Amino acid sequence: MRSSSTLLIAFGLFLASMSVEAIIRPGYGSGGHRPPSSYHGGHHNDDDCTTKPPKSTSTPSTSTSTPTTTTTTTTTTTTTPTTTTTTTTTTTPEPTTTKVKVCPQGYTSFLRTPAADNSFTSEWCMQLIWSPRQPMPINNASALCQASNTEAVVTTFANEEELNVFSLQMAQQFDRVGPATRGAIAVDGRRIAACVSRDRGILDSEECNGTNSFVMVDKHTSPGFTWSKWATNEPSANAWTYDIEQCIQFTVYPALTGPGDNPYNMLNRNNKFNDIYCNMDKAPNEPTNTAYWNFGALCGVLPS
């Protein structure tokens, strides 16, 4: 009996547990969830309310490694050597002949400072030419110069150096040849036309007073030096009958030679300039005084 009772009790408990589960889990037929198969003790797929994930089919991935072929292209640069041909041309230059300008025969070269008042002359050729006629009027001086050279003109000194050269020549000539121990030569310079007058008012005016009354005929010599070397009280513009002192002479009076010589003339006329008559060969007021005689002319020309 005990076994039967035990069985009955166990069965009753089973039923009780089933009722409780039915209450807790609604039935599948009324729209509830189907109990899992484990609930019924089976393994039917249709009884499982859990949606199982789809089976994944793994297709094994096959990696095919294609070998990469790297082609290396080697560029070879060939340098063609450049041959430079140097042609040497020998040019024989034409000989250049630079003509050196020289003074005519008998003339001496003197260097000068070029300036506007000497026509920018840098070299001037000069010669003292003695006249075959002694004394001679200054108006003959131009022809005397041109007889030695057709381009020559009557000229004068530009500086002390030139003066000393020809002053010495004159003194030596007078001492060696004569006919006098002192004398003069014709040089460039003329009284301007407006100052050729016997009227002392005109001659003593500012325009005609002293140096202002003279100009150089030839333009290759600056006049300043000559104008600074006038003898005492010269130019005097003396007049004589039909003539007036319009030309210039250069006098050398080296020494007193006799009791009749005038020391004043020696001191004040040696190596000095004096205005004199152009058409006379002697001073009419002192015809025997050789200091006023012209024995030649100072000539000048450009080198060529």
UniProtKB/Swiss-Prot annotation:
Renumbered residue ranges of the record's region Disordered: 29-100
Coiled-coil spans in chain: none
Keywords for this protein: Signal
Annotated signal sequence range: 1-19
Positions with biased composition (Low complexity): 51-99
UniProt-recorded name of the protein: C-type lectin domain-containing protein 141
